[in-house]
């Protein structure tokens, strides 16, 4: 039994064991993502404390995610022109400066809502370039064979931090204020930057280089044309767009579900958020262990995620809703990590940044539209209607993609090599 557990753990963390550069990156991300989630909680709390307005918190979310809506497509073109390793060093350094700035403002006691909005918008703008660059760097660190494993581990780090970061942030806010959370986040970037600077660029996976497009417009046109004509990538982008738009609006739905539908308080809201995060973490680790991405598995993941939301719609039991959110988290990372892997594996080296940019537009750039739509549906028919519409939309697109996947030539890598327990 012990040997089997060791073999399973070795396979799950294969990219960490096998690639020194990725091991440094992974360690830094574990620390930095916790700081990032602490900052998100602290920003929302600070704005709410200053304004006493939920609408003001909504504006904060708009500032954070609008850059993805506006600039994700162009960012992908820019990423293809840059060195991913140097770009990530620059974007992480800029985020550390921004976190330090809001920390100083908050600790000095002079923070105003517009300060938080500006920092959040600038942080979002930097992350538009940082996110596809980190994906590009992940490919360079591990290569195509271990890419599904590494992407799943990245997702696991993000969702693990999603559990612990807000909890730790809440404790620090209560004990010392939001400014300390910002300072801790700023300090967390030291771990990332140290890992990046310790990497050996000569060990990066080689990629094909081609002449740059004459203009950003030409480069974007090339990426969109390739995505439109490559059926596997087109299917993944269509699925991502629909599921992200309809099913990923928990920031709007969960507070309303807890307060108005279940007539509960912040404790229930925290519980529901946490169980989804736990499920997402487990799903990421399972995906990392499997280390193989397929269109069919991706469609099953999105269908399971959508089905959980559909089943939540009529429920009034906190226990059952928590169970479905946990399962939804497992299916969520099964879908998201597989879809990202498939797009990158199918992408030519010279177009990978552009296709990742298009993916991030479909995944994160639709948050503004989805949030507005969920708010409208909730006002019209409560969370019951919002969850029902999300479930039906996600299931319908998942079924279409699954049926198409039976005729699509897959671009899949063989599973990562089998490990023998040490």
What are the residue ranges of the model-derived segments?
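Alpha-helical transmembrane-bundle signature of multi-pass membrane transport and export proteins
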Residues: 1-422
């Amino acid at each position: 039994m012990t040997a089997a557990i060791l073999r399973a753990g070795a396979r799950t963390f294969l990219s960490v064991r096998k690639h020194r550069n990725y091991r440094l990156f992974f360690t830094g991300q574990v620390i930095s993502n916790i700081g990032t989630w602490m900052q998100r909680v602290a920003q929302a709390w600070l704005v709410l404390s200053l304004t006493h307005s939920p609408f003001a918190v909504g504006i904060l979310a708009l500032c954070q995610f609008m850059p993805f809506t506006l600039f994700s497509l162009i960012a992908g073109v820019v990423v293809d022109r840059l060195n991913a390793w140097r770009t990530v060093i620059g974007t992480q350094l800029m985020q550390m400066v921004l976190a330090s700035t809001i920390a100083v403002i908050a600790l000095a006691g002079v923070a105003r809502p517009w300060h938080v909005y500006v920092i959040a918008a600038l942080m979002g703008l930097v992350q538009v370039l940082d996110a596809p660059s980190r994906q590009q760097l992940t490919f360079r660190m591990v290569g195509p064979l271990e890419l599904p494993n590494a992407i799943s581990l990245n997702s696991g780090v993000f969702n693990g931090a999603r559990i612990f970061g807000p909890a730790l942030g809440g404790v620090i806010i209560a004990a010392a204020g939001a400014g300390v959370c910002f300072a801790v986040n700023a300090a967390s970037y030291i771990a990332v930057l140290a890992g990046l600077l310790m990497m050996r660029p000569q060990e990066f996976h080689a990629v094909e280089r081609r002449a740059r497009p004459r203009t950003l417009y030409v480069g974007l046109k090339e990426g969109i044309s390739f995505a439109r004509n490559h059926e596997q990538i087109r299917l993944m982008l269509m699925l991502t767009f629909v599921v992200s738009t309809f099913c990923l609006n928990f920031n709007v739905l969960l507070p309303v579900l807890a307060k108005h539908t279940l007539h509960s308080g912040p404790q229930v809201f925290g519980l529901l958020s946490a169980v989804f995060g736990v499920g997402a973490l487990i799903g990421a680790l399972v995906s990392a262990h499997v280390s193989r991405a397929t269109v069919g598995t991706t469609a099953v993941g999105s269908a399971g995620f959508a089905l959980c939301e559909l089943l939540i719609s009529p429920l009034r039991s906190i226990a059952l809703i928590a169970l479905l959110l946990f399962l939804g988290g497992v299916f969520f990372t099964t879908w998201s990590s597989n879809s990202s892997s498939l797009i990158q594996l199918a992408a030519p080296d010279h177009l990978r940044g552009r296709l990742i940019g298009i993916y991030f537009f479909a995944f994160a750039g639709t948050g503004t539209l989805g949030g507005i739509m969920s708010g409208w549906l909730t006002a019209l028919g409560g969370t019951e209607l919002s969850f029902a519409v999300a479930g039906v939309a996600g299931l319908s697109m998942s079924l279409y993609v699954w049926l198409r996947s039976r005729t699509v030539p897959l671009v899949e890598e063989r599973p990562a090599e089998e490990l023998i327990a040490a």
